[in-house]
Amino acid sequence: MPLHMQQVHWMPSPPLAPDDGPIDRAHLARMTLGDHGLAREVLAMFAGQSAGVMDSLMGTPSNAADLAHTLKGSAMAIGAFRVADAAEWLESTLRSETEGAEALAALDDAVAEVRLAIDAILKRS
């Protein structure tokens, strides 16, 4: 029985380390049970919610720590861990009654980065 050689087309392997993007796509897929439509819906909801929360936080309302806590939970659900960390920093800063300007700026930057990533994901999907 002759042995036939077959050309195997090489495909690059996925990276060993996860992408360092602002959204952990594997986490998002787990949270949405692999449902691409649901993932898009959740991302769109987060984009809207985060914009509203950031607008509110810029006015330093009395419930700012609670708003930061809410944003932290939402960010964790979609895999936006930098936003979650920044929201946690702001929340703990506000609850300790110390100046939160630096933490708020970090959160604003993290949210802006995630919203850009969400826009790109929604446009390409």
What are these regions (language model features)?
Residues H9-M11, H36, G73:
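Short alpha-helical transmembrane interface motifs in multi-pass membrane proteins
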Residues A68, A75, A87-L90, L94:
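Hydrophobic helical segment of the DHp/HisKA dimerization and phosphotransfer domain
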Residues G21-T70, A77, G100-L122:
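Long, amphipathic alpha-helical coiled-coil segments characteristic
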Residues M1-D20:
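Intrinsically disordered or compositionally simple regulatory linkers and C-terminal tails
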